[in-house]
Amino acid sequence: NLYQLKNMIKCTNTRHWVSFTNYGCYCGYGGSGTPVDELDKCCQVHDKCYDTAKHVCKCSPSMTMYSYDCSEGKLTCKDNNTKCKDFVCNCDRTAALCFAKAPYNNKNFKIDPTKGCQ
């Protein structure tokens, strides 16, 4: 879920999680157009993963609680999750790891989606 995604970001990243809430065309609520960079692409992939969870697993990914471990920047989804919980956990895990390795461009924070996301 979104709260756990925030905590996963905190586990893998030195940058504050708020930096990812309104970045590019896909990081934050909604998303459209072409991702502006690699980090924005991470968010687009995460959005698509959540869409798949909704349609294939029939669950609400933004509200689904799952079990995971964070140790020294490493994230592990626990084995005791249901199929849906495991799917959502892996969506969030993949996004957090992607955020950690993608370059952050300050000019893409809080861009105007009506101008930059066509």
Swiss-Prot record:
It is found in: Secreted. CDD domains: PLA2c. It catalyses: a 1,2-diacyl-sn-glycero-3-phosphocholine + H2O = a 1-acyl-sn-glycero-3-phosphocholine + a fatty acid + H(+). Expressed by the venom gland. Disulfide bonds join C11-C70, C25-C117, C27-C43, C42-C98, C49-C91, C59-C84, C77-C89. SUPFAM superfamilies: Phospholipase A2, PLA2. InterPro entries: PLipase_A2, PLipase_A2_Asp_AS, PLipase_A2_dom, PLipase_A2_dom_sf, PLipase_A2_His_AS. Keywords: Calcium, Disulfide bond, Hydrolase, Lipid degradation, Lipid metabolism, Metal-binding, Myotoxin, Secreted, Toxin. Coiled coil: none annotated. Snake venom phospholipase A2 (PLA2) that has only a weak enzymatic activity. It has a myotoxic activity in vivo (dystrophic effect). PLA2 catalyzes the calcium-dependent hydrolysis of the 2-acyl groups in 3-sn-phosphoglycerides. This is Basic phospholipase A2 nigroxin A. It comes from Micrurus nigrocinctus.
